[in-house]
Swiss-Prot record:
Keyword Signal: yes
Organism encoding this protein: Escherichia coli O139:H28 (strain E24377A / ETEC)
The protein's Enzyme Commission number: 1.8.5.-
Protein name as catalogued: Protein-methionine-sulfoxide reductase catalytic subunit MsrP
The record's account of how the chain is modified after translation: Predicted to be exported by the Tat system. The position of the signal peptide cleavage has not been experimentally proven.
Lineage of the organism: Bacteria, Pseudomonadati, Pseudomonadota, Gammaproteobacteria, Enterobacterales
Known function: Part of the MsrPQ system that repairs oxidized periplasmic proteins containing methionine sulfoxide residues (Met-O), using respiratory chain electrons. Thus protects these proteins from oxidative-stress damage caused by reactive species of oxygen and chlorine generated by the host defense mechanisms. MsrPQ is essential for the maintenance of envelope integrity under bleach stress, rescuing a wide series of structurally unrelated periplasmic proteins from methionine oxidation, including the primary periplasmic chaperone SurA and the lipoprotein Pal.
Stored SUPFAM superfamilies: Oxidoreductase molybdopterin-binding domain
Domain of life: Bacteria
Entry GO CC: periplasmic space
PANTHER family membership: PROTEIN-METHIONINE-SULFOXIDE REDUCTASE, PROTEIN-METHIONINE-SULFOXIDE REDUCTASE CATALYTIC SUBUNIT MSRP
Compartment(s): Periplasm
Length: 334
């Protein structure tokens, strides 16, 4: 089935409009001082567009060897590498979208240890080299949808999580998978200072049901645009679950633990009425403070680059994953 494309050449904003003075742009968008008083996550991405014309460098990671299976290639317009590497949420390095690229160079990613434990027959420990050599790597072009109602299309490189979990041999007691980011406050300013880190409790933790973790789409990601992940994108290994909001994509993972009970997750702990455990992309279930019916695609230009496009149920992966939630109330279990 041919996939719907929502971006047209006419959607791209003229260069003369993009380079309007900041005050003119704010006025044109109807953004008032009151709007800017909203909680940071609701508007920090918007303000990041007005930081000037400087662009962070492209990822400087080493080139990776990987295949490009036809099943994971498509004709979706890719988000440019400078946006993928320079427009990020990684609160351990600051709240502004440009902060991770500016501050994440302090993160030491080699050596690295990733432990797989819990309800498994064969606990595992992987080192830095294992992450790129133990499993065949493949490039997958995935949509990425942030809960803040913006989106990207990214050529991630990695291996299916189910291959790693299969080596550990989950026991019959395993129902969930818990993930944990490195805790290194000496390297991560947001873990040192609650103001810098958005008031979250660290280390960052996430979780999936076991069947979600075993789904072929769920990717342990070690690279982007042909190279190893840069620190601001979650080096050396992060999770990508393309049918869920981006905050489920935990970065810089040091622990994977299979559990009997549903594990706590950082954003659900911080604001349970706003961020659910499932976090499936759903245009029919709004965030309490903004609509999820549409999204802004982050393309090659600035804030006025494209028109909004419709949000797709499960981020366009409904055919592959909807059966996981048969009989589940998606409004209640958001």
């Amino acid at each position: 089935m041919k996939k719907k494309q929502f971006l047209k050449e006419s959607d791209v904003t003229a260069e003369s409009v993009f380079f309007m003075k900041r005050r003119q742009v704010l006025k044109a968008l109807g953004i008032s001082a009151a709007a800017l008083s909203l909680p940071h996550a609701a508007h920090a991405d918007l303000l990041s567009w007005f930081k000037g014309n400087d662009r962070p460098p492209a990822p400087a990671g080493k080139p990776l060897e990987f295949s490009k299976p036809a099943a994971w290639q498509n004709n979706l317009p890719l988000t440019p590498v400078d946006k993928v590497s320079g427009y990020n949420n990684f609160y351990e390095f600051g709240l502004d979208k440009a902060d991770p690229a500016a501050n994440a160079g302090s993160l030491k990613t080699d050596p690295w240890t990733l432990k797989i434990s819990g309800e498994v027959a064969k606990p595992l420990t992987l080192d830095h080299d294992d992450l790129t050599r133990r499993f065949p790597l493949e490039e997958r072009i995935y949509r990425m949808r942030c809960v803040e109602a913006w989106s990207m299309v990214v050529p991630w490189i990695g291996f299916p999580l189910h291959k790693l979990l299969a080596l550990a041999e989950p026991t019959s007691n395993a129902k969930y998978v818990a993930f944990e980011t490195i805790y290194a406050p000496e390297q991560m300013p947001g873990q040192q200072d609650r103001f810098i880190g958005g008031g979250l409790k660290y280390p960052y933790v996430e979780g999936l049901r076991l069947d979600e973790a075993m789904h072929p789409l769920t990717l342990m990601t070690v690279g982007v645009y042909g190279k190893a992940l840069p620190p601001q994108n979650g080096a050396p290994v992060r999770l990508i679950v393309p049918w869920k909001y981006g905050f489920k994509g935990i970065k810089s993972i040091v622990s994977i633990k299979l559990t009997r009970e549903r594990p706590p997750t950082t954003w659900n702990l911080a604001a349970p009425d706003e961020y659910g455990f499932y976090a499936n992309v759903n245009p029919h279930v709004d965030h309490p403070r903004w609509s999820q019916a549409t999204e802004r695609f982050i393309g090659s230009g600035g804030i006025l680059d494209v028109q909004r496009q419709p949000t797709l149920l499960f981020n366009g992966y409904a055919d592959q994953v909807a059966s996981l939630y048969r009989g589940l109330d998606l409004r209640e279990n958001f």
